[in-house]
Amino acid sequence: MFIKTGDKVRVIAGKDKGKEGTIKKVLASQNRVIVEGVNIVKKHQKPSNSNPNGGVIDTEAAINASNVMLIDPSTNEPTRVGYKFVDGKKVRVAKKSGKTLD
């Protein structure tokens, strides 16, 4: 997957189009990501030891990885991601600027 935890991304499709956030979690087997502050849903919580009252809480839901685009740290613009071998290691490369991301 072209995105890693901690990357800054912009949502390019869906109800949160245009919002930016950092990747909290990558679900590679499902090709989905959880982005901080994006795709907020209401979740009904049963009372438990950690939350004795229960109730409705707001939480981030996963979105498809194809709906986000990595933001190039050097230009602060969304870019596609390519791969290149440098010193025998495979590194991610921003397609717009050509700079390595790892």
From Swiss-Prot:
Kindly list the GO CC terms recorded for this protein.
ribonucleoprotein complex; ribosome
| Matching SUPFAM superfamilies | Translation proteins SH3-like domain
GO BP terms: translation
State the Gene3D superfamilies in the record. 2.30.30.30
GO MF, one annotated term: structural constituent of ribosome
Keywords linked to the UniProt accession? Ribonucleoprotein, Ribosomal protein, RNA-binding, rRNA-binding
SMART domains in alphabetical order: KOW (SM00739)
Which InterPro entries did the record assign?
A: KOW, Rib_uL2_dom2, Ribosomal_uL24, Ribosomal_uL24_CS, Ribosomal_uL24_KOW, Translation_prot_SH3-like_sf
Q: Which domain of life is it from?
A: Bacteria
Q: Which PROSITE patterns match?
A: RIBOSOMAL_L24
Q: Name one Pfam family in it.
A: KOW
Q: Which family does it belong to?
A: Belongs to the universal ribosomal protein uL24 family.
Instruction: Please describe the quaternary structure of this protein.
Output: Part of the 50S ribosomal subunit.
Sum up the protein's function in the record's words. Answer: One of two assembly initiator proteins, it binds directly to the 5'-end of the 23S rRNA, where it nucleates assembly of the 50S subunit. One of the proteins that surrounds the polypeptide exit tunnel on the outside of the subunit.
What is the protein name for this chain? Answer: Large ribosomal subunit protein uL24
What organism does the record attribute this protein to? Limosilactobacillus reuteri (strain DSM 20016)
